[in-house]
Amino acid sequence: MSKYTTYIFDLDGTLLDTLGDLAASANYALRQFGFPEHSTDDVRRFVGNGVRRLMERAVPPGLAPAQFEEVLATFRQHYMHHAHDTTRPYPGIPETLHELRRRGCPMAVVSNKMMAATQELVAHFFPEIPVAIGENEAEGISRKPAPDTVNEALRRLGVERHTAVYVGDSDVDILTARNAGLPCISVLWGFRDRPFLLQHGATQLITHPVELLSF
C-alpha cells in the first residue's frame, strides 16, 4: 500500500505521450513561415517549460518578436485541433489511475501546457481526474517550476499538503515539487532519462506506473 493518498501529476511525458502531436504542430507552424523543421528528438529536448518556450527553442535565432508571436499563434491554433491525433496514455497509466480512484485517492494534473489544451486532454483521456490546471499567467498562476499550479490543485481538491506526492518526468517537475514542499516521484518512461533526472536531483524513480500503487 502506498504511503501517499493524494497524487499530483504532470501531464506530458508522465500520463500522456504527447510528443508526436507537439512535434507535428511545431513543424506545421514552422513550415507556414518557411523555417526549418525539427526531428522528434529535437522537440523532445524543447518541451517541458510550456509552449512558448517550446517555440522559442524551435524558431531560428534572432526572429523578430512580432513574427514569433505569429508563429506561436499558428502553433496554438493547429495544436488545439490536433492535440490527440497520436497522443495516447502510456502503458499502465489507465489501469493505475483506475486503481487509485478505486482507493479513493484525490488526483489532479498540473501542466505548463495551455489551460484549454490541458483541460481538454484530461477530460478526454482521464475523466476520473477532477482537477486539471494548465498555464494561466493571466489569472496570476505562474507556470512551473513555481508552486502556484500545485497549490491551486491542492486547494481545489481540499486536501492537506502532507498527504500529497508529485509525479513527473522532468527537471522542471523536480523543481516544482521542491518549491511546493512535496516529495517527487520521477518516472522513467517520459521525455528525460535516468542520468538526466539523477543529475537534476531525482531521489525516487520508477520504471512502470503500477509501482505508484506500492511506492
Briefly describe each language-model feature range:
Residues W189-L198:
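Short, glycine/polar-rich helix-capping loops at beta-to-alpha or helix-loop-helix junctions
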Residues Q204-H208:
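Short acidic-hydrophobic, aromatic-tinged amphipathic segments that line or gate anion-handling sites
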Residues S2-R45, E56:
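Active-site neighborhood of HAD-like aspartate-dependent phosphohydrolases
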Residues D85-T86, M114-V165, D171-A180, R194-P195:
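Substrate-recognition "cap/lid" segment bordering the active-site pocket of phosphatases
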Residues A29-L30, G50-A64, A153-L154:
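Helix-loop "lid/cap" segments that line or gate small-molecule binding pockets
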Residues A26, I93-A123:
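Substrate-recognition element of Asp-dependent hydrolases with the DxDx(T/V) motif
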Residues E56-H98:
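Metal-dependent phosphoesterase signature
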